[in-house]
């Protein structure tokens, strides 16, 4: 795996290994303090009323725990968990087949819900509000609508592109929850918990070194932790991951002190060399990257940490970004 892709948030082949590291209960979940406080109320209230929980929309940058939270909600409600993804639902019949096979109170999780086409969205409207499906049978003058009742259920949608969800769909989610980037202290806890699960010794300095380069994202923190553990097992067989060892391993992986990899640095240097606002299409062409990938995986953290700024005319490097490139001798 190249260092260019090590930080990126798409589901890479090894991501299924992180399932074992996921918390199963809401009390085990680290971070997102306000979200968790509110979720506890919503879950407990629905459980005591023996009703399906209101529909939930989880949104925010990739890798912050949206899928994990969906699993936890189902677990805490003691109901079945069903899942699919927006791109997998190509026609209304696909969604109808899933909805009619749900059991009462089930949780249905739709990842990348912003990628649903409008025809499928319209099927969801009546399903979410009235627990029924309006199916059109026949064509032309002979067409008629059949109303099919479905079990009461909870829909959990997850998206990294909140603005791409249509207003009618967005308004049908009674519980919208925004997930924020993690602090270094929170990521230290995530890493230490993972180390305990897979029986790897790591001290505070080692966990903090990895956490500080994880771009505020648990998925990245766990991936970097696994790679540092690989170096430990290869070079020492046994021992503890300390700050010096973690720093050395991350340097070999091409991750700098701010957590930037080669693709991030290419982005920053290109914007610097443009000497002014530069459009996203121009950046994507220069980096040979998809516009959506840049907007979802590279830019959020750079904007959050004030290294770049979005303006109506394009992206510009901030003073902080310029000083970082200069002090790190990247320019």
From Swiss-Prot:
Protein name: Holliday junction branch migration complex subunit RuvB
This protein's record includes keyword DNA-binding: yes
The reaction(s) this protein catalyses: ATP + H2O = ADP + phosphate + H(+)
Region of interest (Large ATPase domain (RuvB-L)), residue spans: 1-182
GO cellular component annotations of the record: cytoplasm; Holliday junction resolvase complex
A GO MF term: ATP hydrolysis activity
Keywords: ATP-binding, Cytoplasm, DNA damage, DNA recombination, DNA repair, DNA-binding, Hydrolase, Nucleotide-binding
GO biological process: DNA recombination; DNA repair
Binding site for ATP: 21-22, 63, 66-68, 129-131, 172, 182, 219
Record's comment describing the protein's domains: Has 3 domains, the large (RuvB-L) and small ATPase (RuvB-S) domains and the C-terminal head (RuvB-H) domain. The head domain binds DNA, while the ATPase domains jointly bind ATP, ADP or are empty depending on the state of the subunit in the translocation cycle. During a single DNA translocation step the structure of each domain remains the same, but their relative positions change.
Primary site of residence: cytoplasm
Purpose: The RuvA-RuvB-RuvC complex processes Holliday junction (HJ) DNA during genetic recombination and DNA repair, while the RuvA-RuvB complex plays an important role in the rescue of blocked DNA replication forks via replication fork reversal (RFR). RuvA specifically binds to HJ cruciform DNA, conferring on it an open structure. The RuvB hexamer acts as an ATP-dependent pump, pulling dsDNA into and through the RuvAB complex. RuvB forms 2 homohexamers on either side of HJ DNA bound by 1 or 2 RuvA tetramers; 4 subunits per hexamer contact DNA at a time.
Region entry Small ATPAse domain (RuvB-S), spans: 183-254
Annotated localization: Cytoplasm
Region (Head domain (RuvB-H)): 257-331
Residues annotated as binding Mg(2+): 67
Binding site for DNA: 310, 315
Subunit: Homohexamer. Forms an RuvA(8)-RuvB(12)-Holliday junction (HJ) complex. HJ DNA is sandwiched between 2 RuvA tetramers; dsDNA enters through RuvA and exits via RuvB. An RuvB hexamer assembles on each DNA strand where it exits the tetramer. Each RuvB hexamer is contacted by two RuvA subunits (via domain III) on 2 adjacent RuvB subunits; this complex drives branch migration. In the full resolvosome a probable DNA-RuvA(4)-RuvB(12)-RuvC(2) complex forms which resolves the HJ.
Any single Pfam family the record assigns to this protein: RuvB_N
Organism of origin: Anaplasma marginale (strain St. Maries)
InterPro entries: AAA+_ATPase, AAA_lid_4, DNA_helicase_Holl-junc_RuvB, P-loop_NTPase, RuvB-like_N, RuvB_C, WH-like_DNA-bd_sf, WH_DNA-bd_sf
Name of encoding gene: ruvB
E.C. code: 3.6.4.-
Listed CDD domains: AAA
